[in-house]
Design a protein with these regions (language model features):
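Alpha-helical packing segments of well-folded alpha/beta enzyme cores
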Residues: 83, 154-158, 198, 231, ...
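A carboxyl-terminal module marker
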Residues: 591-627
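Short alpha-helical segments and helix-capping/turn motifs at coil-helix boundaries
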Residues: 11-20, 25-30, 83-90, 155-160, ...
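Catalytic core of carbohydrate-active enzymes
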Residues: 266, 278, 288-294, 313, ...
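Aromatic- and carboxylate-enriched substrate-binding clefts and catalytic-loop regions
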Residues: 1, 168-378, 410-414, 418-419, ...
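Catalytic and substrate-binding clefts that recognize carbohydrates or anionic sugar/phosphate headgroups
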Residues: 1-145, 159-160, 480-507
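Aromatic- and glycine-enriched glycan-recognition loops and surfaces
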Residues: 22-26, 80-83, 115-226
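Secondary-structure transition/turn motif
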Residues: 45-47, 563-570, 623-624
Length: 627
């Protein structure tokens, strides 16, 4: 992860853990590079390095590591996928995140601080404002479960808060802060029980729990019960399913960091009933992707620079064999800027993970923290992210041994314009979405309504995802209207997008329905992937693929074919309701359906409500509300 960069021609980059989190810093280096000329190189070393891509001498690549011997793997292959798979053959394939990991996570410390009334503090549910202190100032001490007349300051209250504001939440880390721990008893086992109590409550509400790492993960003599750790009991007894590493534990990086995530990567399935590990790390190296996703470090939100440099950072991470990349929502520090806050939530809808790192910023790091209009906009995009889960999960599975989820434009559309930095502020999310985030104030008014310039639309026809307006490709789009609510995102004509019902966590997904949104054009297809979303079964071949095809005939007729699902997994629902959302320009003359060789008679519904309640029905929405 080279922050702020992905195209290195004419540059020198450092291959070392710098613990530098802003533009130009190195968060998680990999001693590997590949070229569009059809080759790649990986150094087998943990030593620091410098890679010069024609900076000192044009046309020459000069690589060096602080080592007295040369140990390098050379890879000769055709294309990004083949070269990435050569790298994975040596270092391991990227992990497929559990489904809950695609939802927001909330991170803070809820076992350490004291809260006193203060008119300039944070407004709580009792109508009063409070300020926190890490020192005992006579205030109310927080706890995980709120059992000490302190519920509104507890970790349980966080879960309630998301629920009461109708906001999606997938997981919670209650000890993300130095000296926090997760219990206030005199024994480690007592604290484990306290953590389990939180875990039970969280799981009842569709939320998983995890832990931040400050120290050794296994019992160690001389460490107080507060900071003592036992990862085996945390996983086996308390139900921990997430681990976030930080510089206090893997700050050395290199082999130490790699061994650390590998340890947890083996413990979680073994002691967690085959649970799929969800590890978020930094200071990674070649091989980190086998066990963990990466976060980019601690940065300041509330400023446009935060969004700007992260776009090429995410693109570069996928190109470097680490498709599971994330960062804090609107930063860990700073904030109080509605425009930046909403724009960050918007573009990260089309990324794997979202972290609300609370407790350090100018405001609380909740999606509703800045009030309206940010609350409604953020909620709407979070719900959209939940709807897109079948599409996101399918491209995440592809990223295990194929294209990354977040794709540089040149991966799908290689040409002189895309093979450089001209398109560094836009990307493809899978094969069908083109995302062009708002990363600066161009002509913004006081409400944050703005425009986006320099959007490159490749060949083909591209459709504004929120208005349905069509644009011919092979052009640069300027002055694209982007009111505060609107992310510039385009869907390729011919797209097939698997969807699910809007939801707040994986438990709310209706497994008995499958939804496909289609933009018929020519002949196109998409392979949907699904599995249980929680276990390591997928590594043993347990999963289901469904091929969906769309074809526009010579008479402008559209045929959509869903082929029989292949495979199986624990909990797979074989009998499902199927809903098509087919984007057309006028009412079709005829709509027919066939299941196998059996024709199904369809009835025209008179309203959306009748359509939603009916079976074997169709409805033509002449003016759909796309936003």
């Amino acid at each position: 992860v080279q922050n702020g960069r992905f195209s290195h021609k004419g540059k020198v980059i450092s291959i070392e853990n710098q613990n530098s989190w802003t533009d130009g810093g190195v968060a998680s280096p990999t001693p590997y590079y590949w070229s569009t000329n059809g080759y790649g190189m990986m150094w087998y070393t943990f030593k620091k390095g410098k890679y010069d891509f024609g900076a000192s001498e044009e046309g020459k690549v000069k690589l060096s590591h602080e080592s007295d011997y040369l140990d390098v793997f050379y890879m000769i292959n055709d294309g990004a996928v083949a070269l990435l798979n050569d790298f994975y053959q040596l270092t391991g394939n990227p992990v497929l995140l559990p489904k809950f990991g695609f939802y927001q996570g909330h991170l803070n410390a809820y076992n350490r601080d004291y809260w006193t009334e203060n008119e300039k503090g944070i407004l709580f549910e009792d109508g009063k404002r409070y300020k926190e202190s890490q020192k005992d100032n006579g205030g109310i001490k927080e706890s995980l479960n709120g059992e000490k007349n302190n519920y509104q300051f507890s970790a349980r209250a966080v879960i309630d808060r998301y629920k009461n504001h109708d906001m999606p939440l997938g997981w919670l880390l209650p000890n993300d802060g130095y000296g926090a721990g997760y219990g206030q008893t005199e024994t480690l086992d007592g604290n484990i029980q306290n953590l389990k109590s939180l875990g039970d409550y969280a799981r009842q509400n569709g939320v998983e729990i995890g832990l931040w790492t400050q120290s050794d993960l296994h019992p160690k003599e001389g460490v107080s019960a507060l900071l003592q750790r036992d990862i085996v009991k945390e996983v086996r007894d308390a139900g921990v399913r997430v681990l976030k590493t930080d510089v206090a534990w893997v700050g050395a990086g290199y082999s130490f960091g790699l061994n650390g995530v590998a340890d947890v990567g083996h413990i979680m399935p073994y002691y967690g009933s085959d649970a799929r590990p969800f590890i978020i790390s930094l200071d990674g190296w070649a091989g980190t992707q086998r066990y963990a996703g990466i976060w980019s470090g601690d940065q300041t939100g509330g400023v446009w620079e935060y969004i700007r440099f992260h776009i090429p950072t995410y693109i570069g991470s996928g190109l470097s064999g680490q498709p599971n990349i994330t960062s804090d929502m609107d930063g860990i520090f700073g904030g109080r800027n509605v425009q930046v806050n909403t724009r960050d939530f918007q573009w990260k809808t089309f990324t794997p993970m979202e972290l609300n790192m609370d407790g350090w910023g100018a405001n609380e790091k909740y999606p509703h923290a800045l009030g309206e209009p940010a609350t409604s906009i953020n909620r709407w995009y979070l719900k959209l992210k939940s709807e897109l889960m079948p599409y996101a999960y399918s491209i995440a599975k592809e990223a295990v041994d194929g294209m990354p989820m977040i794709r540089a434009m040149f991966l799908e559309y290689p040409n002189a314009y895309t093979q450089g930095t001209a398109t560094q502020y836009q990307y493809l999310y899978g094969p069908y979405f083109l995302v062009a985030p708002i990363y600066q104030a161009t002509k913004a008014d006081e409400q944050g309504n703005d425009i986006r310039n320099g959007i490159y639309l490749p060949e083909g026809v591209w459709i504004d995802y929120f208005t349905g307006e069509k644009y011919d490709g092979n052009r640069i789009l300027n002055n694209f209207a982007a009111p505060l609510w609107k992310l510039p995102v385009f869907v390729k004509n011919g797209a097939i997008i698997p969807l699910t019902n809007p939801n707040n966590n994986v438990n709310e997904i209706d497994k008995g329905i499958r939804i496909y949104e289609l933009y018929p054009y020519g002949k196109s297809s998409f392979t949907e992937y699904d599995d249980d979303g929680v276990s390591e079964e997928y590594k043993r071949g347990k999963g289901v693929t469904t091929n969906i095809e769309s074809e526009v005939g010579s008479k402008n007729d559209v045929t959509v074919t869903i082929h029989p699902a292949k495979g199986d997994f624990t909990g797979f629902v074989k009998e499902k309701v199927t809903e098509f959302r087919i984007n057309v320009t006028s009412l079709p003359k005829k709509v027919t359906a066939q299941v196998g060789k059996k024709k199904v008679k369809l009835t025209k519904a008179a309203s959306k409500d009748e359509f939603a309640k009916g079976e074997d029905v169709f409805f033509y929405d002449e003016a759909p509300d796309l936003n």
